[in-house]
Amino acid sequence: MAVCIVLAHPDRASLSYQIFHETAAILEARGETVHRQDLHGDEFDPVMPLDELKRRMSLDPHVSRYARELGESSHIIVIHPDWWAGPPAILKGWVDRIFRPGTAYDEIHDFPGDDPEFIPLLSEKRVSIVALSYRDVSSRTLKAFWRDTVFAWCGVKKFTLYHLKDIVGKNANEISDWKRNSVHSLTDNTM
């Protein structure tokens, strides 16, 4: 199986990008298939058009590729800054457009118009979230969004949150150590 690594940060000089790039490079050097989803680099449009919502599927090539890669991967790694106690808008748009029926879950209707039964499709996947915060903030809202909402709905049970807090208060050595430990944990957990 493959590893899907999603990055939601516009700055290629950011710590988020460094973790994204180094994690992917280590996994690729090991011979793993790595799907890189750099949302800003790919110019992903997070806004779901009305026709896509009504059609319940997307014709956007990024959405199709991202959904296929998510399905092919045994480990999903999402890397993002913590902005206002949550992920950036581009990443919320990724969830809205990718986590649809047929990719993250299926719906079964016994009769037209009845409430559907939801079947999770990601239950065999491992998920790692890497969030970086400038201040010392709680991880509670990130866990509530990612673990308890998005991935619980899709059946994921193997979930880990790596949350670097108070970047402003850390020196370069502390940040470097945290980055090295994060990349090590992400690449060790993949095997």
Where are these regions (language model features)?
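N-terminal beta1-alpha1-beta2 submodule of the flavodoxin-like/Rossmannoid cofactor-binding fold
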Residues: 1-104, 169-191
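Short beta-strands and strand-loop turn motifs
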Residues: 6-7, 130-132, 162
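A generic structural signal for alpha->beta connector loops
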Residues: 31-33, 124, 156-158
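Active-site donor-binding loop signature of nucleotide-sugar glycosyltransferases
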Residues: 39, 132, 164-166
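Conserved active-site beta-strand-loop modules that form the wall/rim of enzyme catalytic pockets
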Residues: 75, 128, 159
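Short, glycine-/small-residue-rich phosphate/pyrophosphate-handling segment
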Residues: 107-154
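Glycine-rich phosphate/pyrophosphate-binding loop and the adjoining helix
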Residues: 138-191
